[in-house]
Amino acid sequence: MKLSWLEAAALTAASVVSADELAFSPPFYPSPWANGQGEWAEAYQRAVAIVSQMTLDEKVNLTTGTGWELEKCVGQTGGVPRLNIGGMCLQDSPLGIRDSDYNSAFPAGVNVAATWDKNLAYLRGQAMGQEFSDKGIDVQLGPAAGPLGRSPDGGRNWEGFSPDPALTGVLFAETIKGIQDAGVVATAKHYILNEQEHFRQVAEAAGYGFNISDTISSNVDDKTIHEMYLWPFADAVRAGVGAIMCSYNQINNSYGCQNSYTLNKLLKAELGFQGFVMSDWGAHHSGVGSALAGLDMSMPGDITFDSATSFWGTNLTIAVLNGTVPQWRVDDMAVRIMAAYYKVGRDRLYQPPNFSSWTRDEYGFKYFYPQEGPYEKVNHFVNVQRNHSEVIRKLGADSTVLLKNNNALPLTGKERKVAILGEDAGSNSYGANGCSDRGCDNGTLAMAWGSGTAEFPYLVTPEQAIQAEVLKHKGSVYAITDNWALSQVETLAKQASVSLVFVNSDAGEGYISVDGNEGDRNNLTLWKNGDNLIKAAANNCNNTIVVIHSVGPVLVDEWYDHPNVTAILWAGLPGQESGNSLADVLYGRVNPGAKSPFTWGKTREAYGDYLVRELNNGNGAPQDDFSEGVFIDYRGFDKRNETPIYEFGHGLSYTTFNYSGLHIQVLNASSNAQVATETGAAPTFGQVGNASDYVYPEGLTRISKFIYPWLNSTDLKASSGDPYYGVDTAEHVPEGATDGSPQPVLPAGGGSGGNPRLYDELIRVSVTVKNTGRVAGDAVPQLYVSLGGPNEPKVVLRKFDRLTLKPSEETVWTTTLTRRDLSNWDVAAQDWVITSYPKKVHVGSSSRQLPLHAALPKVQ
């Protein structure tokens, strides 16, 4: 027997849900239309005013990419020249501009998470936004909160932040604010449950020898999707994000870019998202179906790259003309796109792209792939870096986690002989950008691989920075960057005052395989003989310091407690200032204050939550059952009584801190926001007209492979090229999908990020934090809540901050808990509720160092 979504979800309170019980994604129609609520009001009105002047083909032009490698950006829509609206330029990545030049390479999202610093997250976002804007880019394809990081070996975890939804949500939102305050539309991606690279695309899987009919399905219950994977996207919507990218995977066997439950219900009806949903590149699988399910923009426009075919473009024009897609739906798409454009002030900053993603040549054809159009200047070589190296260097240092320190750090600079050991300390012999999309692990790891990358303007290696430091102090420094030269390593380590050993572990996007790792990591071990390299040094030098550059946790059990391993640092993926950032920490110019954004287990088995690496459904879509529910990372370790080597939130400092004086105060806060019980009717703007209004303009020189909105003739069937044109829509259009009448507002909806009551501040918590050491440093107070239910995690992170304190200085850190912070998702009520179970608050320096705790008073 297959259960309904709600029945299956309800079972998770007491049991594990089977694959069959999660095999269905319930329909939700019609697609909610934007209404300009909250901070969107002005942008919405401007969007309505301009869209009201557009013809149908002009609206369609905004919704459909012009094709892969046709124009300068990785994605570009058509424009509306008649109204002085250029095509939108969309460009990767979450850590800087991909396929460009004279831009910065920022630290990855996982490093931002390690800072636990809201202000730094904002400043990084703002700096990236400035660079994108200066290059003529309208939409940055980032940041990412999907993957969240369900499995530690997931290939693209590093593009996001942390497997904790609260930590991710806060830093996700701050990044978005920074990008959009710089005048660029941010894209929250990949929505949703995009937690592994294996089987994410049919053609990609075929390249690795797997014959599947459809992409992997992430099968999840209603409670888990709300409390874990949707949580950071709610923060993004509340922050005003302009765009959301839907993902390649299926959710409960319905594709992410045509899943009416996740797009229409969760995103637009519950969270009140007012911006536009774009497809990931190649994630668009239908025309009418995706339009009615809530997709607003097709990227890059063609069905497969350079196929000259599109589910939208001409076919979307036809679908509106023949009534299959109602006018209000395409109007809503256009309004959402233009509202996002106006909200960030892009109209004031707009300029055409001044670079080409496809060539570094100064001159070339305007339309790259077909080599057609005017021959013109395509690269203007605009330097957009400003002074961003400063925030990059600071973020790199402030994200370096001191995992272990037996009084070995900081270095004094007086060390007579310094050994630098490991390939990860040095340069890529091919050059910093020598591997396309960073698809190799040569030299120091400062950025992982895939589309989520940027070109380095330069890369300061650890070897370069440390050598400069040692020579400044008249010492001696030697480097061995061959991880297999163990005999030479042993000899040098015996002579050294300190041995700095550099190791790494890489991962990335599934279209690139590095050393047999097809995007996802094959394991959590160090790459390139790293464990043996460390042991060779530690067995011969009593002051061995290990530096790890990695995309996530690695297994350190073989050597972390070696008596000669005196310190361990995790530096993540620190970007272009890698060596300088590290030297700042090693030599004490920066006191490390970072905290691990994930758990370091003793074994891979300790994490559970294995990736699906082999077919498990014949040649059908592989099935990935999220049967662990909300118990990932530290939540799972706590549930299974697994003792980690380093817990979530752990990180040492060159000073010490004390936490005391926990105080709790109930607040009489209540939202004054009036939430309507029903929406208005779906608005329409302008007239549709007739087929004769939308045939190709006379005299137009068509560009090969370019995706246009026009018709070849007034014969809609002939223009569509669809052999199934004319089938009975009653059999294929879901019930209610075209209904533009007023709709009920969901109990969990009614505002940006959900019902405004969720954000009522119910309890104030204050704690005294004191620097008890002899140097200034950063404390990161962490507040966790026990929600009390018998099947809830032991604790869940809810609040945090990063505080700089001088020696002996103390401060009172105050934060508030909202209704959302204290609630669980009720699958029967389809709403957030504060349960009657007793709740506690815990405060300390990590998920397992929580000296302060108290019962919370009951609130509603």
Curated annotation (Swiss-Prot):
It catalyses: Hydrolysis of terminal, non-reducing beta-D-glucosyl residues with release of beta-D-glucose. It comes from Aspergillus aculeatus. Gene3D superfamilies: Glycoside hydrolase family 3 C-terminal domain, Glycoside hydrolase, family 3, N-terminal domain, Immunoglobulins. Keywords: Carbohydrate metabolism, Cellulose degradation, Glycoprotein, Glycosidase, Hydrolase, Polysaccharide degradation, Signal. It holds the Pfam family Fn3-like. PROSITE patterns: GLYCOSYL_HYDROL_F3. It is an enzyme of class 3 (hydrolase). It comes from the Eukaryota. Belongs to the glycosyl hydrolase 3 family. GO terms for biological process: cellulose catabolic process. Glycans are attached at residues 61, 211, 252, 315, 322, 354, 387, 442, 523, 542, 564, 658, 668, 690, 712. Residues 1-19 form the signal peptide. Its EC number is 3.2.1.21. This is Beta-glucosidase 1. GO terms for molecular function: beta-glucosidase activity.
